[in-house]
Structure formats: C-alpha cells, structure tokens
A protein has these predicted regions:
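Bacterial N-terminal signal peptides that target proteins for export
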Residues: 1-10
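C-terminal motif of bacterial Sec signal peptides marking the signal peptidase cleavage site
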Residues: 18-20
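N-terminal "mature-domain start" segment
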Residues: 25-64
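Short secondary-structure junctions
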Residues: 44-57, 100-115
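Secretory pathway targeting signatures of secreted, lumenal, and periplasmic proteins
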Residues: 48-88
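Short, solvent-exposed recognition patches
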Residues: 82-108
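Signature of long, low-cysteine stretches enriched in small and polar/charged residues
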Residues: 104-146
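Surface-exposed amphipathic alpha-helical segments
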Residues: 151-191
C-alpha cells in the first residue's frame, strides 16, 4: 500500500473517530436571521434615470449595481442599503464621524445634516489612496440614514471619479444630486 493511501486512511479514521461522524446527529443548526429579512427590499432601483440591479447581499447590506457592472470595486455608480437592527442613530453618526476624522477610510471631506431626530442626510468625498487599486479614484457618497421600527436603515448612492477629476466641481455636483437621490432613493420599510 502506498504512503498516500495509508496517510489518507489514517486521517479519515481519526476524523471519523474524533468528529463523531459515525453516529447520526439530531441537533439542528439555525443560521442567524438576516437584518435584511426585516425589510422589503426591491430587486431594482432607479436613480437619476439609471437602473441598478440587486447583485450582492449579506446579512446587513444589499448592493445594487448598474446592469453592465460586476460585483467588486470596479463599479462607477453603486446603491447600497444597510439595515442594523440594534443601532442607535446618534451613536451611529458619532461613530461614523469619528472614523472619518481619524482617517480610517483615508482622506475624506464630509458633512452631516439632521432632518429630524429620526433621520439625517450626509455626504462623503473620499480621496484616492495612492497604490491601492481598489481605492485609487475619488468617491462621493450621498447618504440617508433613518431610524425605523425594525432598525436603522442606511442608504448610499455612490459615484466614482478618476483620480485626475476636478475636485472643485464636487460640491456643486453634490448640491445638484442630493435632492434627486433623496426623492428617488428606494423607500425600504419594515415588513
């Protein structure tokens, strides 16, 4: 018998013995509930005349990409919806602002504007990070955060610009796009 066959047989026997694979189990493993299960998510979103398709989601965040763009960092425009069942809106804002001020996400400009005690709007302008191919462009995020009965809903509309873009035009663009985003963002509500 070859060494590979003997090694495999020994490893398999140890796994069966130590893993208890020889006896059937009746224990059910229940996966954690997704925060997104508590809201009605659309499959498509339209903002500024462009259609975004739900292409990726995890337990807390759904990402919508343009039809011809792939999941990952090479998108040009992106819509995302995050639901956090346990977040406090004020603590969320403080934590986000602290991270921005610290430079955790690289150099950034930002502004937060309270709408009322249950919602606010914000924008971020992230600067390119030299040498990082995933973050080598400017990125503008228009953000709306609202406290719902089922958790905190955070909606982002993100736009990327080449690292040679004229930064002086970003604030005018934000002023133009923010009302469109707020009027057309998906109205995701609790189930």
């Amino acid at each position: 018998m070859s060494f590979k066959k003997v090694s495999f047989a020994a490893v398999a026997a140890v796994c069966l013995f130590l893993g208890g694979c020889t006896q059937p189990r009746t224990t059910q493993i229940e996966l954690p509930k997704s925060a997104l299960d508590s809201v009605n998510l659309p499959n498509e979103v339209a903002i500024a005349g462009e259609k975004f398709i739900l292409k990726q989601k995890n337990a807390r965040t759904a990402e919508y990409y343009l039809p011809n763009e792939k999941v990952g960092f090479k998108w040009t425009k992106l819509v995302s919806i995050t639901v956090d069942e346990n977040a406090d809106i004020n603590e969320y804002q403080r934590t986000f602002m602290t991270a921005l001020k610290s430079g955790q996400f690289g150099k950034a400009e930002y502004d937060f504007k309270s709408i009322n005690d249950k919602e606010y709007q914000a924008y971020t302008i992230y600067y390119p990070i030299a040498g990082n191919p995933d973050f080598d462009n400017y990125e503008i995020n228009l953000i709306h955060v609202k406290s719902l009965n089922c958790g905190l809903r955070v909606t982002h509309y993100a736009l990327k610009f080449l690292n040679i873009a004229d930064r002086s035009k970003f604030h005018a663009l934000i002023k133009q796009k923010m009302p469109i985003f707020l009027a057309q963002m998906p109205q995701v509500e609790c189930k």
